[in-house]
């Protein structure tokens, strides 16, 4: 059974590719490599022992997407493609609205077209890569799926708008009168971290990392002088931001569980994917120091626009609906992230 992964060469997409292949699916990667590296494909082939099927192009190109869908006839689509940096979205909101919202509209139109004309035999089935940023700045934690939604950045706003589009599809049942009802799984990620245990693939930002873990490991490996800790006066135990860090392989397993649930039970859902445990920035730094045996220098800096004090999940609904839960610890995330970074000091660039 083919599964199309938009943005499948990216950090989460590449790990999900492995999990899907191990689960017996045939994942097909769709990517334009704007935020990823072609060498990932070679690494995936080494890990899985099989060649990787790639469709190179842009998710904004609707006619091309239609042709890809007709050719591969996937039983499901996992939509990762998009821009993902909170800070950048504040500085350049139109980029995020165009790429993220426009890309989602393009994909939905393409899926609707191939199902409406009978080119695809299955119900349109989509797993969407959403984000905990749709909860804005929550007043209490842990966060449940029925908490009020909001946003503190254009990135979060783009995810919220896409969720609303998908909700409308679920309520109306179709994009057009001729297309069948949709099966949609919305996965609200918390903070992905770690890497594949092989050390062959991991998180490799094209520029200065926006996520904490790759920044810390780049400092530990000597690529950067120190970690900027944005905010030391949050109302948290040590004054730094608290997040729910989830191992990327646990997150990948969540996508497999989501697809199986949609295909087997024909029921749409929205769930959190997190560990349910909040960890502060300083706690992550200390964990990486223990794992790597290196000192990680840091400096406090002003809070970043769009950041919130604390954000961690109640993931009990995912366990109930999908039979999924996060299994790996913070120490395992740090160990795998360090293995990747130390083996690949310059990431995929050699």
Spans of features found by a protein language model:
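Glycine-rich, flexible loop segments associated with nucleotide phosphate handling
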Residues: 120-126, 179-184, 206-212, 240-245, ...
């Amino acid at each position: 059974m083919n599964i199309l992964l938009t943005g499948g060469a990216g950090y989460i997409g590449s790990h999900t590719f492995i999990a899907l292949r191990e689960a017996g699916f045939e994942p097909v990667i769709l990517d334009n490599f704007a935020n990823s590296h072609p060498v990932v494909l070679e690494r995936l082939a080494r890990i899985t022992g099989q060649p990787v099927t790639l469709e190179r192009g842009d998710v904004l190109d609707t006619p091309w997407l239609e042709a890809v869908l007709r050719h591969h006839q996937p039983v499901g689509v996992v939509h990762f493609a998009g821009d993902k940096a909170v800070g950048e979205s504040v500085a350049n909101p139109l980029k995020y609205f165009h790429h993220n919202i426009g890309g989602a509209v393009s994909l939905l139109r393409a899926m609707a077209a191939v199902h409406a004309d009978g080119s695809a035999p299955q119900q349109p089935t989509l797993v969407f890569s959403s984000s905990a940023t749709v909860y804005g700045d929550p007043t209490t934690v842990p966060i449940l799926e029925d908490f009020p939604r909001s946003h503190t950045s254009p990135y979060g706003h783009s995810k919220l708008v896409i969720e609303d589009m998908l909700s409308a599809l679920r309520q109306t049942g179709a994009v057009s009168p001729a297309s069948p009802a949709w099966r949609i799984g919305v996965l609200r990620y918390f903070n992905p971290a770690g890497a594949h245990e092989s050390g062959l693939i991991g998180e490799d930002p094209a520029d200065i990392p926006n996520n904490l873990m790759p920044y810390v490991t780049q400092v530990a490996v000597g690529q950067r002088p120190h970690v900027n800790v944005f905010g030391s006066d949050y109302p948290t135990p040590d004054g730094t931001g608290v997040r729910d860090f989830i191992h990327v392989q646990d997150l990948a397993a969540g996508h497999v569980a989501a697809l199986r649930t949609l295909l087997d039970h024909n029921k749409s859902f929205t769930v959190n994917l997190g560990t349910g445990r909040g960890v502060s920035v300083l706690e992550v730094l200390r964990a990486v120091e223990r794992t790597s045996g290196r000192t990680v220098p840091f400096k406090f800096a002003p809070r970043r626009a769009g950041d919130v004090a604390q954000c961690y999940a109640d993931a009990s609904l995912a366990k109930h609906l999908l039979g999924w839960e996060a299994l790996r610890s913070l120490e395992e995330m740090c160990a795998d992230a360090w293995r990747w970074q130390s083996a690949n000091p310059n990431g995929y660039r050699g």
